[in-house]
């Protein structure tokens, strides 16, 4: 089961995602990211975008995934409210393939909150918890 939350971090907002699988944790932290930007509960699945990124390790993979989503928000004007991803390790690197579901940003509908300027490695953690679930977190640049 995917879950996400924001957490206090000095003057910034931390985002954290949980899942029964690594993929669910990545999906959940992406939801947390977009809930910093808008009210994700108001986003409809009107567009489906294919996502494919890779990284040398899980941290760089998470960075690349969220950076791609933020790019699509900034350049294409899209907001996302759901994700389905698969992660595999191949030839010494991690590959994430999946889909992001959302729609064009509408300030009247989506209730804008904060502007996320960039994804960072600040306070980034990806770990398996004692209960077997996965957690992914970081502090984006607001």
Curated annotation (Swiss-Prot):
Similarity section: Belongs to the archease family.
GO MF annotations in UniProt: calcium ion binding
Disulfide bonds: none
Pfam families in the record: Archease (PF01951)
Stated name of the protein: Protein archease
InterPro entries per UniProt: Archease, Archease_arc, Archease_dom, Archease_dom_sf
Entry keyword annotation includes Nucleotide-binding: no
Origin superkingdom: Archaea
Protein residues bound to Ca(2+): 12, 141-142
Free-text function comment from the UniProt entry: Activates the tRNA-splicing ligase complex by facilitating the enzymatic turnover of catalytic subunit RtcB. Acts by promoting the guanylylation of RtcB, a key intermediate step in tRNA ligation. Can also alter the NTP specificity of RtcB such that ATP, dGTP or ITP is used efficiently.
tRNA processing found in the keyword field: yes
Keywords: Calcium, Metal-binding, tRNA processing
SUPFAM superfamilies: MTH1598-like
GO BP: tRNA splicing, via endonucleolytic cleavage and ligation
């Amino acid at each position: 089961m995917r879950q996400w939350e924001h957490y206090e971090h000095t003057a910034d907002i931390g985002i954290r995602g949980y899942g029964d699988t690594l993929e669910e944790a990545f999906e959940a932290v992406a939801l947390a990211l977009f809930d910093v930007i808008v009210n994700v509960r108001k986003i409809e699945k009107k567009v489906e975008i294919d996502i494919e990124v890779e990284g040398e390790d899980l941290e760089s993979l998470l960075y690349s995934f969220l950076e791609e989503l933020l790019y699509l928000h900034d350049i294409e004007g899209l907001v996302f409210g759901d994700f389905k991803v698969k992660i595999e390790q191949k030839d010494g690197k991690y590959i994430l393939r999946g889909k992001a579901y959302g729609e064009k940003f509408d300030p009247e509908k989506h209730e804008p909150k904060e502007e996320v300027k960039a994804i960072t490695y600040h306070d980034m953690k990806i770990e398996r918890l004692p209960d077997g679930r996965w957690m992914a977190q970081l502090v984006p640049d607001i």
